[in-house]
Amino acid sequence: MIKVNTSLKPADLQSKLERFWQLSGEKVRLIDAEYDLSKGTPVFTIDGKYTTRGWTEWTEGFLYGSAVLQFDATGDKEALAYGRDNTIRRMASHVSHIGVHDHGFNNLSTYGNLLRLQHEGRIEKDDWQSHFYELALKVSGAVQASRWTVIPEGGYIHSFNGPHSLF
């Protein structure tokens, strides 16, 4: 059973969060240095090393989005460059992909966070990048909206499997 400590404050977690972000930065760099992307996107680990499933690329947004969040939390400009450059170079195939349900994982983790950081003034605002990120999110949203399924009580967005599936 989980015990909720209602007296806990964010400041109480400072040292743990510092350690978390230190480890996160190490992992982002390690995956970049050691993982062979020609094998596909890393999905899970075997003996502590990432490997792929071969049939899905649903984690690619996390790969680069984690680097963007690393910058967001720590100011690590190297992580930002890695996340932004790879979003621009490698993530376009996910934007309009109708055969997956992973638009949030892939597109919000990358384009969405980069756009948010621009709006917050955390990274330089560049018009072409802003428009690029916005277009990616609009197209991704349109793909999701095309899955809208009407039911008597309203509706829902079905998965890539079809109206019978919320997966």
Language-model segments: residues:
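Glycan-recognition and catalytic cores of secretory/periplasmic carbohydrate-active enzymes
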Residues: 1-167
